[in-house]
Amino acid sequence: MIKKIRQIYKDFYAEKERNLPQAEKATFLRYCVFRLRYKMPESFYFQNRLYDKQVDPAECLKGTTRVIHGWDISLKRNKPDASLWWRIIHHIDFWFSRFLYPGLDARDYFMYEFYNLKHTLRKTFVTNGYLHQLDEKLNGPANSKERDLIEDKGTFNALFPDIITRKWTVSRGLTREALGAFLNDLDEVIVKPLDGQQGLGIFKKAIHSQEDIDDLFQTIQGQEYILEEVVKQHWQLGRFNPSSVNTVRVYSVFHENQVVITGAVFRLGRTGRVTDNYSTGGMAAEIDVDLGIITSRAVNYLEEEYYVHPDTKEIILGAKIPKWDEIKETVKNAHLRISQFGYIAWDVVVTEDGQVTFLEANTCGGFELQQHPCRKGKKQLYDRFMK
């Protein structure tokens, strides 16, 4: 750790020397505060001349309360029985780690068990802060309207009519009569917020009568929803949990005019749940990108791990993903169509008749699914795309 701090000190003054005389007043201590608060490397600090700005120390440290709160929540969830001595030692270690690995938060620290790792392994993990740097580097500003091409589920579906062939419509401007016509030959429909994330706000509605249609219309009226025909999944995926569509999350990067598949995970829902989302009770397990075989345990947001599905008793480890080569090819071809985005996380499903289709995609797919199941850092894999 001391060696790492010395390296940061050395890098700081090397950058300062390159930016003289404007950076004459830049101090290492002030930079340390910025590094902790804003998770920035030395180059960013100097390139943006943050040493010249009149920064209120109270404003600079405003995030401290949030960080402490995050630590308390993670500690209670992951180490509720930890001794006072353990809590003190590792709380200090956590703050040093935030300095050494910009962007680290308490969830990262506990999820990847930093308290059991040495620096050589800690530095291999992608932190939450690194994710946002990668996202901005490859996809542009987070608030860019262009991201609506992917983040808006209706716009995304319209981009790939040859891949997304199920029936769908959006609630915006939808009349009662148009809704009835859309639902005419459907027994049920899945309803999602147009810009929703993490499986929040999603529900399934059975359609058996005009009363069901009227009830659904009242629910979606004036709201921003996408309504979709329920996907019937391949039996090899559905056997793990029939109540949810169990998806394959594939990560791709557009680099040097080609698409690179950088990772993949299988997401599994729980009995009675409509979605397989990690943040709403689902589980995730790593997939070998070359073989299409699950190579890790499945874990959930609460740090529980499974090698066999707890509800259906299906064996997870070693399971083969159907149509794997076709999944990779479909993702690569789709990414080439929207290559203005450098980093995309695709939610893929194989239908009961073997068609590969998308449920949705995200421009800032988190790394917890890539790193948590296998507890292996993926930073080295992505560093080459940051140059």
Please name every model-derived segment:
Residues 195, 229-231, 252-254, 268, ...:
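Short, flexible loop/turn elements at secondary-structure junctions
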Residues 136-248, 255-257:
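Active-site nucleotide/adenylate-binding loops and adjacent lid/helix of ATP-dependent enzymes
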Residues 198-202, 272-273, 368:
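Short catalytic/ligand-binding loop motif for oxyanion handling, primarily in non-cytosolic enzymes
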Residues 3-6, 305-343, 350-387:
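C-terminal active-site "lid" helix and adjoining low-complexity regulatory extension at the edge
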Residues 47-181, 331:
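Conserved N-proximal alpha/beta basic substrate-recognition cap immediately N-terminal to
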Residues 241, 245-329:
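ATP-dependent carboxylate/phosphate-activation module, predominantly the ATP-grasp catalytic core
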Residues 1-59:
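Intrinsically disordered, low-structural-confidence terminal and linker regions
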Residues 186-188, 245-249, 261, 343-345, ...:
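Extracellular structured ligand-interaction cores
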